[in-house]
Amino acid sequence: MPIKIPDDLPARPILEQEGVVVMRRTDAVRQDIRPLRIGLLNLMPNKISTETQLARLLGATPLQVELTLVRMTDHVARHTPADHMAAFYRPWAEVRDERFDGFVITGAPVEHLPFEEVGYWPELCRVLDWTQTHVHSSFTICWAAQAALHHFHGVPKHLLPAKAFGLFRHRNLAPASPYLRGFSDDPHIPVSRWAEIRQADIPAGSGLETLLDSAETGPCLLDDPAHRSLHMFNHVEYDTRSLADEYFRDGQGPLPAGYFPGDDPARPPENRWRGHAHLLFGNWINEIYRTTPFDIAAIGGGRPPANDAGPIEAAAG
């Protein structure tokens, strides 16, 4: 099944050119299927690029996904046209009484600030608490993952002396995890951040499990079953040229490690993480499908395995 997004969202023609099946609203109405409702709280400055990256991954599974774009209620986006925000994004205050099968919260370029000094921190805390009563499963990315670890578990973030920047080899620490089904032993994942969380700070007894880590950049992906969340500190969703664009945008500082062939920025980078990005989001969507209530109104009242038909292949068979 395809992803259902607004007919005139800029991501649509890009995804269609890539072969992602994008459903028009009129077609979706004719299918007697309850789509998985996925919300995307987009905190990134370039919202159009980010929504395209994530829609690409969410739309690549056999299940029909209905994507709702969400923004912070009072925060005004400065890098995305106001007409785009008005046309495609709903403030969180408007959706807070609704329920979602999945909810993605992106990173934001505010790592240098203490959490409490971020202008929308109080509302983000309310959003995180709301996911525990109105969302079946959450997926936080980069700064949002650091924020969730701090909010739910008191885990601090640590500023780095230099930006962790590049394409780094990671270790698969939990090959039996349903979220890492199909993963290789050493996936490469893009990293771009000025702060980190440390394995030593993860509280004993928290139930947090580190699924992926890197010897160079630390924890990458944590499973948080107590809060029905995955926390991804890096950027598996990035486009092939995302790190290159950051490098040239920032005045050509240190090269992104392990990214340009031969460390030559004149040579086009190769995408060595796309397959794992699709696997991770596909596995997450599959776990949502297997465990979310068929009646979306029941989300928040438990986690009954209403659709426990096994992996997507069995469900779609």
Swiss-Prot record:
<feature type="active site" description="Proton acceptor">
    <location>
        <position position="235"/>
    </location>
</feature>
<comment type="similarity">
    <text>Belongs to the MetA family.</text>
</comment>
<comment type="pathway">
    <text>Amino-acid biosynthesis; L-methionine biosynthesis via de novo pathway; O-acetyl-L-homoserine from L-homoserine: step 1/1.</text>
</comment>
<keyword id="KW-0963">Cytoplasm</keyword>
<keyword id="KW-0028">Amino-acid biosynthesis</keyword>
<comment type="function">
    <text>Transfers an acetyl group from acetyl-CoA to L-homoserine, forming acetyl-L-homoserine.</text>
</comment>
<dbReference type="GO" id="GO:0008899">
    <property type="term" value="F:homoserine O-succinyltransferase activity"/>
</dbReference>
<feature type="active site">
    <location>
        <position position="237"/>
    </location>
</feature>
<dbReference type="GO" id="GO:0005737">
    <property type="term" value="C:cytoplasm"/>
</dbReference>
<dbReference type="InterPro" id="IPR033752">
    <property type="entry name" value="MetA_family"/>
</dbReference>
<dbReference type="GO" id="GO:0004414">
    <property type="term" value="F:homoserine O-acetyltransferase activity"/>
</dbReference>
<dbReference type="InterPro" id="IPR005697">
    <property type="entry name" value="HST_MetA"/>
</dbReference>
<keyword id="KW-0808">Transferase</keyword>
<dbReference type="InterPro" id="IPR029062">
    <property type="entry name" value="Class_I_gatase-like"/>
</dbReference>
<feature type="site" description="Important for acyl-CoA specificity">
    <location>
        <position position="111"/>
    </location>
</feature>
<protein>
    <recommendedName>
        <fullName>Homoserine O-acetyltransferase</fullName>
        <ecNumber>2.3.1.31</ecNumber>
    </recommendedName>
</protein>
<feature type="active site" description="Acyl-thioester intermediate">
    <location>
        <position position="142"/>
    </location>
</feature>
<feature type="binding site">
    <location>
        <position position="192"/>
    </location>
    <ligand>
        <name>substrate</name>
    </ligand>
</feature>
<keyword id="KW-0012">Acyltransferase</keyword>
<dbReference type="Pfam" id="PF04204">
    <property type="entry name" value="HTS"/>
</dbReference>
<feature type="binding site">
    <location>
        <position position="163"/>
    </location>
    <ligand>
        <name>substrate</name>
    </ligand>
</feature>
<dbReference type="GO" id="GO:0019281">
    <property type="term" value="P:L-methionine biosynthetic process from homoserine via O-succinyl-L-homoserine and cystathionine"/>
</dbReference>
<keyword id="KW-0486">Methionine biosynthesis</keyword>
<feature type="site" description="Important for substrate specificity">
    <location>
        <position position="192"/>
    </location>
</feature>
<feature type="binding site">
    <location>
        <position position="249"/>
    </location>
    <ligand>
        <name>substrate</name>
    </ligand>
</feature>
